């Protein structure tokens, strides 16, 4: 087993040794794990979930949540070959018609949701950390090139990747989306970003060892970085996005829900996906819309809030 796989094995053991947490946290972790790692099959209008779980610790964790929270006993179909880090893998079938709907994995027409269920997209606190932990356990890997170390989490769709990116950003960690031949993954580059994320989701025991391993292999990453045009552009974009988010937050405080629903929805969508571009934001909307349409709705929301603030004699969205 190479060093990267050893580091991944350490991380998985660390995460799986954590207490499962309260019901909301357990549900968030399970939902993300299934969204990022399971197949949903429709058989005679019944949703059957099949998921490959590697390692007996993960298998026991998932079975425990299914039994204790949802009263479901999944069926172990078969064992599959060991994965790259030597864990035994198991194919688990969950044949319960209500579970996918309870978790928000499907809509009313039995179609899989495009991104993440709404309750996960709005998650915070321990549920947010459970969401990210579940995604990492489902499809997270460590990678490295000549000069760069990264964690990558493979996503089933662009919309799902965008939602995970937003969730990671809520934990004050920079994540980006990369598309390779129609497949999407969320990438967290450099140990300086990866380590805080892993600590946030509970992997405190393994992070120090992973940091030491990376710094020994890539000492050139420890030196100061020279500023460049990309850094400057990123900073300008971040400042503009932060200003927009602050105005929208103030607008929602002023309006207190008294505004057209489609405008409120656009504002909340931006707050839930602070680092997404307008084009990406439009794709996340239900139904999807163009970047001009989503930008127009946000502008009208801000304009309406500023007019309301002037009428009430209170600070507007620029305050």
Swiss-Prot record:
InterPro entries: Homing_endonucl, Sporu_reg_WhiA_N_dom, Sporulation_regulator_WhiA, Sporulation_regulator_WhiA_C, WhiA_LAGLIDADG_dom. It comes from the Bacteria. GO terms for biological process: cell division; regulation of sporulation. Coiled coil: none annotated. Gene3D superfamilies: Homing endonucleases. Keywords: Cell cycle, Cell division, DNA-binding. Residues 277-310 bind DNA. One of its GO terms (molecular function) is DNA binding. Involved in cell division and chromosome segregation. PANTHER family: CELL DIVISION PROTEIN WHIA-RELATED. Belongs to the WhiA family. This is Probable cell division protein WhiA. It comes from Tropheryma whipplei (strain Twist). The gene is whiA.
